[in-house]
A protein has these predicted regions:
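Active-site-adjacent beta->alpha loops and helix N-cap segments on the catalytic face
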Residues: 84-94, 155-160, 205-225, 243-246, ...
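Glycine-rich phosphate-binding active-site loops on the catalytic face of alpha/beta enzymes
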Residues: 73-88, 255-267, 307-325, 361-395
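Terminal amphipathic helices with adjacent charged low-complexity linkers/tails
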Residues: 82-97, 140-153, 157-159, 189, ...
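Alpha/beta catalytic cores of nucleotide-metabolism and tRNA/nucleoside-modifying enzymes
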Residues: 1-21, 108-111, 176-177, 183-187, ...
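Catalytic cores of alpha/beta
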Residues: 66-69, 243-253, 287, 292-311, ...
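Short beta-strand/loop segments at the ligand-binding rim of alpha/beta enzyme cores
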Residues: 47-56, 102-107, 227-236, 278-293, ...
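Bateman/CBS regulatory modules and CBS-like beta-alpha motifs in cytosolic regions of diverse proteins
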Residues: 27-50, 57-59, 88-128, 133-136, ...
Length: 500
């Protein structure tokens, strides 16, 4: 007869944290959000840690190289999507690893034969007022000039005016050679009172820009997540089919950590993938696995050698696995169960395997709840898809700016490898949807606000570290009426004519 779990399966929204004693030391500035990313033995330090407990999901509409850089600057890690060619994913990893903080690859480029109307259209598209003029209009073409808002007046110039007639030519520009350090570049900017400094190589080709506005920004990133060579950390998703070809390419490109991207991780296919990596690379290549929702699934992957285990099936905002297949578990219940298994595994073996809560995060406080329930960090998709740095397009929907967001199990992603059980026959139904999410601006502003809430709540619980939160947190289940009571009610909000 089938096994029935006792008790109901709960979501994060059904729990609240009960405040605890806060000492005078419990202030947000004293809170550390550092947390382990990969397995380690008792008494040792993990090979990789996060400075903030947030990683981005392995999704086409979420984790590209721009977002990977932006998140690493805040202290987290992006897992670049694997639903692309091996060459493209490896190139994406290489771009993140070669990125120099403060050196920006130009995404606003034009040829001298273009017109003022082209400049205006490009500015509208990118939001940037500095446009590089290269011979072929590419980001790495031979630099021939620059156009800023000071080079033209729309009211006094014809739209068809060629760029070459009003650009600032190369001979009148101050540039710096490739190899210039960030400190040297900033000194040039301040000495010559520049807003931007183009970096060019020996052939006169554009390499990057250094902007005055980025100087202070760089100083404001104390949580940057860097490797031993001062490069940003980056992760990448792999599957259980072409790993023998994909993993070596990603390792050669410099990837720091891998994750097997699958909607269901309690399988022979994940075991074979991890075993192949261990036989080929030993412990030098870090790889997470999942997803699972119970203790048995966790122990299976931990015994296989997974460096961390992802928890969650069907809880993502665009995931419909529960609806189409009837499998899954409430995210809060799954996290609690798996984290208990992790602690038991640690007591038995002396090996700590971090747990990643993947899915089910609707509100910022759900992150704190997941951490309090035992998760070491959370994986977010919808949250990051809203930002400028995500790969998807920004669109206007009925007067509201939105970003496109689709699941890896959707027809659009065509990533059947994530949802296959390993046979040769492809699945014929979808486990994800294609959708929009409200545009929310820059990643940095939003992440800092979210983490400010996490730190504040931790102080309310009397905790200065994530481990301390897990030890001191007191949680209570709430009724549906309590959830309503917790929001605004019995007033008319100024942003609406409807009573709430």
């Amino acid at each position: 007869m089938a096994y029935f779990f006792s008790g109901q399966s709960h979501t994060f929204n059904e729990y609240l944290l009960v405040p605890g004693y806060s000492s005078s030391e419990c202030i947000p500035d004293n809170v550390s959000l550092r947390t382990p990313l990969t397995r380690f033995r008792a008494g040792e330090e993990p090979a990789l840690s996060l400075n903030v407990p947030m990683v981005s999901a392995v999704m086409q509409s979420v984790s590209g190289d721009r977002l990977a850089v932006a998140l690493a600057q805040e202290g987290g890690v992006s897992f670049l999507y694997g639903s692309q060619s091996i060459e493209d994913e490896a190139a994406m990893v290489a771009r993140v690893k070669s990125y120099k903080a403060g050196f920006v690859r130009s995404d606003s480029n034009i040829s001298p034969d273009a017109t003022l109307s082209d400049i205006l259209a490009l500015r509208e598209q990118t939001g940037h007022s500095t446009v590089a003029v290269t011979e072929d209009g590419t980001a790495d073409g031979r630099l021939v000039g620059i156009v800023t808002s000071r080079d033209y007046r729309v009211s006094r110039m014809a739209p068809e005016t060629p760029v070459r007639e009003f650009m600032t030519p190369r001979e009148k520009m101050i540039t710096a050679p490739d190899g210039t350090s960030l400190k040297e570049a900033n000194n040039i900017i301040w000495e010559h009172k520049l807003n931007s400094l183009p970096i060019v190589n020996d052939e006169g080709r554009l390499c990057a820009f250094v902007f005055r506005k980025d100087y202070d920004l760089h100083k404001q990133k104390p949580n940057e997540l860097l490797d031993s060579q001062k490069r940003y950390l980056v992760g990448a998703g792999i599957n259980t089919r072409d790993y023998a070809e994909r993993v070596p390419a990603l390792v050669d490109a410099g990837v720091d950590v891998l994750v097997i991207d699958s909607s269901e991780g309690y399988s022979e296919w994940q075991k074979r993938t991890i075993e192949w990596i261990r036989e080929r690379y030993g412990d030098s290549v870090k790889v997470g696995a999942g997803n699972v929702v119970d203790a048995d699934g966790f122990r299976f992957l931990a015994d296989c050698g997974a460096d961390f285990v992802k928890v969650g099936i069907g809880g993502g905002s665009i995931c419909i696995t529960r609806e189409t297949k009837g499998i899954g578990r409430g995210q809060a219940t799954a996290v609690i169960d798996v984290c208990r298994a992790r602690d038991e595994y640690f007591r038995e073996t002396g090996i700590y395997v971090p747990v990643c809560s993947d899915g089910g995060i609707v509100h910022d406080h759900h992150i704190t709840l997941a951490l309090a329930m035992g998760a070491d960090f959370v994986m977010l998709g919808r949250y990051f898809a809203r930002f400028d740095e995500s790969p998807s397009d920004k669109v206007n929907v009925n007067g509201t700016l939105m970003k496109e967001y689709w699941g890896e199990g959707s027809n659009r992603a065509r990533n059947w490898q994530r949802y296959d059980l390993g046979g040769s026959k492809k699945l014929s139904f979808e486990e994800g949807v294609d959708s929009y999410v409200p545009y929310a601006g820059k990643l940095s502003d939003n992440v800092q606000q979210t983490l400010a809430k996490v730190r504040s709540t931790m102080c309310n619980c009397g905790a200065l570290t994530i481990r301390e939160l897990q030890e001191k947190a007191r949680l209570t289940l709430v009724s549906s009426v309590s959830i309503v009571e917790g929001g605004a009610h019995d007033v008319v909000l100024k942003t609406s004519n409807k009573p709430v």
